[in-house]
Amino acid sequence: MASEQLARRENTTTEKEIHVEKHRVPKMATHFEHLAEQAKESDITAGKDTPQGSIEALQAGERVKDHAGKAMGDIGGRGKARETHELGAHFESLADKVTDHAAANVVGNKESQREARGGVRDVGKFEMRTEGGEKGNKDRPELKTRTREVIGRTEKERGRESGGQVVAEKGRETETARGRVGAENEGARTTAVITCTLEKGGGTQKPIREEERESESERSAWEQISNYSDQATQGVKEKYERAKQAASETLNTTTQTAQEKSAQAKNLAAQAKDATLEKGQQGYAVTKDTISSAAKTASEKTAPVAEKAKDYTLQAAEKAKSAGGTTASYVGEKAVQAKDVAVESGKSAAGYAAKVAADLRDKATAVGWAAAHFSAEKTVEGTKAAAHVVEGAAGYAGHKAAELASMSAGAVKGLAASAGETAKEYTAKKKEEAQRELEAKKPSQPQEAEERPSEGIGETVRQYAQKPKPSEGNPQKEGTGSIVFTAIGETVSSAGEKVKKPFKNTMGGESEGGGGKEEGKSVIGKSLTSIGEKLGDAKQREELLDNVTGNITEGGGEVLGAVGETVAEIGQNMMKPAEIVQERAHVRQAGGVLDAIGETIAEIAETTRVMVSGEDERVLRQSVVLETRVTGRAKHEEGSHGA
């Protein structure tokens, strides 16, 4: 029988390998909810589908316990008590494991039934897949009763009827539907299932006690699973609530922080604004105070400066006024000093002024005669030049006109030469006499007058003469200035009269000539008479006196030099009319010779008068008009005589 049993066991189909793939479930709550559903389904079908394999396994465990003594006595055969004892203990531990995992096996059986329908499902962190399809479903009853091969050998020593050796091995997982052993075991792939096959068939009745115990263990397992599921769900909910609360608190904290920061920013902005306004007001006040103080300081500094400037202006005005008064007083002081000096020396101020005036008169006389002498020389030269020019012009006229021109030219030339020589000699004589008288009078002057510088005397006389004295002043001082002006005027007038007389005498000696000669003489006489009258005019005397007085201010020794320069200018101006006469002589006829000579002399006299008197252009224009009239009159007379 042992051989038959062995052959039957060798024909047993090989177990089907079921691969368990590990898959990680993202959410723990989903897993526990799935386990809860499985628990509910198992409660419904608890009495209907009881897996036989698990019950047989339990029975086999009990039987293994009952026959443990026999097995331990038979195995080894030769006093191997220690090994037998260890093997018995091992079987007991295996039986305990089978008992402990009964509920897990029940759950696995339920899941295996679902897998019979095919498909893939998740259990915990594992993905369960059934291979084989319909074939696997057909082989399921056979898989439930599958066992490990047990080779038993009978021992002939004791002569027992049957003997066997039960060898229990750990093998590979034999369940088609693999369940998860224990809710807490997440990665276990192998489970130990021990099935024992007894050689002697026994009854397969299921004790009631075992069923009750299995039910209780199953309930406890499902209760534990439910508790675990509830705890996990509650934990997830608590975590979710805590996370939600933390997020809400974080949001509230963030909002509150943002509000606080915003309020702080507003407060800081308001404080900055207030500080800026305050600083601006302070700066404005400081600037205002600075500007006002600067303006006040400037006004305070400017006011004294303005006052000083005003005072300085007033002082300058006072100084100018006082300077004017000082000048006037200086002139008066000089006059008084001159008077005091004259009184101290035994002479009155009038006598001293008379002597000074006499000295100036003598000097002016000498200067006048020198000027007259020079003028006479220039006049003679101009007349001679005019005569030569007329002679040249007369040569172009006809024969009769040439004779008349020659006669007229000879007469005029002789007249002018004689008159010029006479005037020249007379002026030279008067000049020498005046100089001798001046030199003779110098030793007779008082010692004090000689010691006084001529510049001081000239300045005193000029200031005293220019500044008119008040009417209530000393009449003796006014008389002194008048004496000086009168003396100089008389000197110039007498010089003019003396220059005029020789020309009159010359014209009187030649009055017995022809009609043409008489007309020429009359023209010359008129010209010379006008010269004398102009030189003797009061206005001429005053202007000449002013010029002489102005030159006297530079000192008595510089009077002759100034007069010499004036006479030189007079001579240059005298040459210009001679050139004009020469130009006119080329275009005039012989009958206009006397007119040309008369006009030349008149122009010379007029130029002399203008240079001496210093008249302006208006007087020169009047002289030109007068010259034109004289020329027109001469032409008219010439035309009447020609007719």
Curated annotation (Swiss-Prot):
GO BP term (any one): cold acclimation
Bias-annotated ranges (Basic and acidic residues): 111-161, 169-187, 207-221, 426-442
Expression (tissue specificity): Expressed in the leaf primodium and the vascular tissues of the hypocotyl-radicle axis of mature seeds. High protein levels in dry and mature soybean seeds, but not found in fresh immature seeds.
Record keyword Coiled coil present: yes
Superkingdom classification of source: Eukaryota
Residues with the N6-biotinyllysine modification: 125
Keywords: Biotin, Coiled coil, Germination
Compositional bias per record (Polar residues), positions renumbered to this chain: 223-234, 247-262
Coiled-coil parts of chain: 237-279
Annotated stretches, region: Disordered: 105-262, 426-480, 501-522
Function: May serve as a biotin provider for several growth-limiting enzymes that are necessary during seed development and the subsequent germination stages, and thus may play some roles in determining seed germination capacity.
Family: Belongs to the seed biotin-containing protein SBP65 family.
Full protein name: Seed biotin-containing protein SBP65
Organism lineage string: Eukaryota, Viridiplantae, Streptophyta, Embryophyta, Tracheophyta
